[in-house]
A protein has these predicted regions:
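Short, polar/charged alpha-helical segment
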Residues: 31-32, 187-189
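Append "and occasionally in soluble cytosolic enzymes with long acidic Gly/Pro-rich linkers
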Residues: 64-188
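Extracellular/periplasmic solute-recognition and catalytic clefts
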Residues: 1-60, 71, 79, 83-88, ...
Length: 189
């Protein structure tokens, strides 16, 4: 029987199910540990071989530009996110691997020393965007600090991105508007 996330703890308490695995949300883990403290249940702690990720479609729109992807990374407080989601039971990794995987364990020092961990830094996000040309408004004037940022792009860079603006002088401006998608039935989506 597969337990549903919103009822699995009650089903476990009542004996409807007798095993829980792969708990990753802090509230679930705390509830399970509280139940184990009563002595009625046992638990086994292990490093979970899983991870979450943010993925970009990089063949068009603003995310084709490395600076935009970097700015998004600087705007995510990944430490706070991991702590909030896992209740302090998770950690941040800087690539598509988990701390349970041997290749991470064998290379943890190298990863920590050589990969940019993109610590939360909104000022750095703005700096990266401005250096890449995201300095205009929708009319092609200097960005004032409110509304969307735009960048002048070539026709090739513009592609078929539906939100581009073509000015009377023929310049093409791309708005810094990212079309997001997310997985369903996910507490962080």
């Amino acid at each position: 029987v597969k337990a549903e996330d919103d009822t699995m703890m009650d089903a476990f308490k009542t004996g409807e199910i007798n095993f829980l695995s792969q708990l990753s949300e802090g509230d679930q883990i705390n509830t399970a540990l509280d139940m184990a403290e009563t002595g009625e249940f046992n638990y086994c702690h292990y490093t979970r071989n899983g991870y979450g990720k943010l993925m970009f479609q990089c063949d068009g729109g603003p995310t084709q530009f490395q600076a935009v992807r970097q700015a998004v990374a600087y705007l995510l407080d990944r430490e706070e996110f991991a702590t909030t989601f896992t209740g302090g039971y998770g950690s941040v990794v800087h690539g598509p691997y988990s701390t349970a995987q041997w290749m991470y364990q064998d290379s943890e020092e190298f990863f920590n020393d050589n990969l940019n961990n993109y610590s939360y830094d909104p000022a750095k996000a703005v700096e990266v965007l401005e250096a890449d040309g995201w300095t205009l408004d929708a009319e092609g004037n200097e960005y004032s600090g409110t509304g969307l940022r735009y960048k002048e792009v070539t026709a090739e860079e513009a592609g078929d991105y539906a939100l581009n603006v073509t000015l009377a002088d023929g310049r093409i401006l791309m708005p810094l508007h990212i079309m997001w998608a997310s997985s369903e039935n996910n507490p962080v989506s």
